[in-house]
């Protein structure tokens, strides 16, 4: 599948093997996680907790968009990972995910969001021009 975006105007392209769309059945319906990673140890992920097929979803503290990276890829200590998220201060919506097609096998759409540093919400990144077209994994 393909998974691309711009993070603060820098190109982000998910490597083969890291691009995943996983649908899971939760007690209240379906959830989906869409993600991709780069050779520079960057990761973009969007999680919808109540996924209902095609349509537009707000990204916030319930449906979450994240951008994360390892500051020093030669030191893969998970404690050093820097995470930017749409959770922000827990107020309002900080982005949108649009699913243009979903047939149970393939999912396609676009996204954009502002991610706020989990350790310092005054720092943010802008994720724009997000696009994906991915084969779905069901769990």
PLM regions and their residue ranges:
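A generic structural motif
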Residues: 6, 37, 116-118
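Surface-exposed helix/loop patches within compact recognition domains
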Residues: 3, 10-15, 19-104
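C-terminal or internal capping secondary-structure element at the end of a domain, subdomain, or sheet
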Residues: 95-139
């Amino acid at each position: 599948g393909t998974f691309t975006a711009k993070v603060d105007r820098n190109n982000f392209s998910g490597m083969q093997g890291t691009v995943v769309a996983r649908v899971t059945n939760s007690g209240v319906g379906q959830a989906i996680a869409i993600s991709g990673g780069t050779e520079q140890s960057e990761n973009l992920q969007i999680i919808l907790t109540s996924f209902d097929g095609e349509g537009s979803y707000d990204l916030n503290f319930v449906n979450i968009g994240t951008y994360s990276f390892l500051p020093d890829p030669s030191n893969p200590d998970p404690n050093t990972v820097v995470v930017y998220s749409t959770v922000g201060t827990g107020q309002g919506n900080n982005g949108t995910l649009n699913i243009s097609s979903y047939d149970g096998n393939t999912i396609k759409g676009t996204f954009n969001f502002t991610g706020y540093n989990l350790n310092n919400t005054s720092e943010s990144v802008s994720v724009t021009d997000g696009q994906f077209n991915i084969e779905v994994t069901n769990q």
